[in-house]
Structure formats: structure tokens, C-alpha cells
Amino acid sequence: MVHFVGAGSGAKDLITVRGMNLLKNADVIIYAGSLVNPELLEYAEDSCEIYNSAYMTLEEIIDVIKTADSENKDIVRLHTGDSSIYGAIREQIEQLNSYDISWDICPGVSSFLAAAAAAGCEYLSLIHI
């Protein structure tokens, strides 16, 4: 099973509780090292295999996932923000579907929501400013 986890808007403590628990229980984590706060990897167990996808092709990422899935390992694909808004997961999901690999999405705190919180107002208030 592959869990697409949204890492939140940058701070280690802005990941969702579900996302943190998925990281804690992961056997394999593939993260976007050029974008994701590396402090989030501190939630992983020492035995977890960690891959920085910043230096990997889509084919290499899918190969890691296929191998881990064939060994019944729990896999986290860690993306920035909320991966269901913008996380470049479509092409990965298409590949996973073609190999009958199960997946789900754990949303993260989006940057536009974090911006509203930092501004001390509601998101809809920002639209009217």
C-alpha cells in the first residue's frame, strides 16, 4: 500500500496527525527532498528505508514502490502541502493502477491555509483584500 502524504506547509509540526502516524509506521519513505522539510523524516523509525526523489526519475520511484509493495511493506510518498491539490501525483497513481498497487491520499495543510493563519484572518477574508 502506498500512502500519498501531504507534508503540510513547511513546519514539522504542521503535518496532520494521520500523516505523522503514517510516517512513524512506514517501512519505506520516498520524499521530495528539494521541497519537503527534512525534519519530518525524524518521525520515521531507524529501520525505515528513505529515498530522496529529487534525484530519481518517475521510473525509479515506481521501481522502488513495486519492490517494496511485493515485500508487503508500508510505503509513504511524502509530498509538500496537500498532495491532492498540487503534488504531481496523477502520473504516479496511473502507474500504480497499472500494476494493481493499492494507494490512498492523506491530505496535508495547504500553504494558502497557512498563509491565512499567519495573516491572522480567515482564508475568505484574504480573497477580498
Regions from the PLM with identified roles:
Residues 30-33, 52, 76-80, 103-108, ...:
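General beta-strand structural signal in soluble alpha/beta enzymes
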Residues 1-55:
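Glycine-rich, flexible N-terminal cofactor/catalytic loop recognition
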Residues 22, 64-73:
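Glycine-rich phosphate/diphosphate-binding loops that line cofactor/substrate pockets in enzymes
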Residues 11, 82-127:
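Class I SAM-dependent methyltransferase SAM-binding "motif I" and its flanking Rossmann-like core
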Residues 16-17, 62, 86-90:
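Conserved strand-to-helix beginnings and helix N-cap segments that scaffold or border functional pockets
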Residues 54-66:
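Glycine-rich, highly charged phosphate/nucleotide-binding loops
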Residues 1-5, 71-79, 83:
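Generic beta-sheet signal
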Residues 37-38, 58-59, 110-114:
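Short gly/pro/ser/thr-enriched loop/turn and capping motifs at secondary-structure boundaries
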